Amino acid sequence: MKRRIGIGLAAALLVTCPTTWATEAQSIEIKVEDIASLKKYPKVALIGYAIEQQNFLVKMSTSWGSTSSSTSEVTLEGVSTPAMQAATDRLYADLVKRLEAAGLEVVKLDEVRNDPMFADLKGDKPQPSPSETSFVFDKSKGFKNSKALVFSPSGLPWHIPSAHEEAARFGAGDKMSANLSRAFSGKQPVADVENALAKARGITLLKAYYVVGFGRAGGRVSEMTSFNYVSNRSEKTISAAANATAELYLDKTDTRLALRVPGETPTLRMRNNSSPAADGSGFIRLDKKLSAGADFAVGEPKNANSTETQVGNALSTTLAVVGGLAGIRGVGSASTQEFVVTANEQRYVDTVEALIQTVQAEFVDRLAAAAK
């Protein structure tokens, strides 16, 4: 079920942080999946909370049938770890407060924390906050990993979902490593332990996850092959460009509130390289990117560095090989441009908090309605 809510984001931002600038009004689209069974177990426990702060984007662009590529790398600077950790702690407290204010029966974390199954989920060495993760940005071609820091509240470390329930954008190696680590330790998969914990306590487990993006990376590559009758040879001309833009936003789909209801089996869904996380039996998701624009940034993205590498027997961007078109196959150019987006830390943090608070309010409204 999908529901669209019209809201002036500018108003939400201004209420939360009066010094924040105006932003275009936009709609918040929330998608609800399989949460009706919450009525059976309306008592809830928030056992996971995380904010994924993306800070390095890589986008590789190619043209069909070409050996040439253009790669854009964009780095976020200006936001400190202590500032994001403090924001994460405040936002976690905000969600707990909203759940209680909505009339939901919320199990105190201390009641669940003492359960051996909860300790099993978090592991012998719980994830630190922040922990670094890598992912594929915007279906970038090649094995180019973008990076993010995953923050969790003080005292509530994030636990990585089972590999088959994790978002497809995360590297297969990372997901396999987490699963193998549990298997070698004699532990059950995370999904099985969550199910057992929910069933043993007769409660619905909740996990909140927010994906904070800071910009876009892009580029293009084009090739033109022609025959020079004067020199009697074929020539290939390669044109490549990369670009970057600043934009602070909550990404859709993987920004979610996941529910694990006792005895409920997740709906079977076909998974592909675009599949979102499916770490629960039901979900309340952000179904459309929620953007606050580029006012958090200090100026435009800066081009920090650029490199170009020839692929094949080539000496320049305009490549010539005697012997016809067949002779220039496999000849190309690989270029990389690096950009830096510098944030005003206070504006960045204030805006992230306003965005997440707005979405948390919508998530809690749907959850409370389903529990009645």
What residue ranges belong to the model's regions?
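Sec/Tat signal peptide C-region and signal peptidase I cleavage site
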Residues: 18-22
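Bacterial N-terminal signal peptides that target proteins for export
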Residues: 1-8
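Bacterial N-terminal signal peptides
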Residues: 8-16
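A structural "domain/chain start" motif
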Residues: 23-283, 287-372
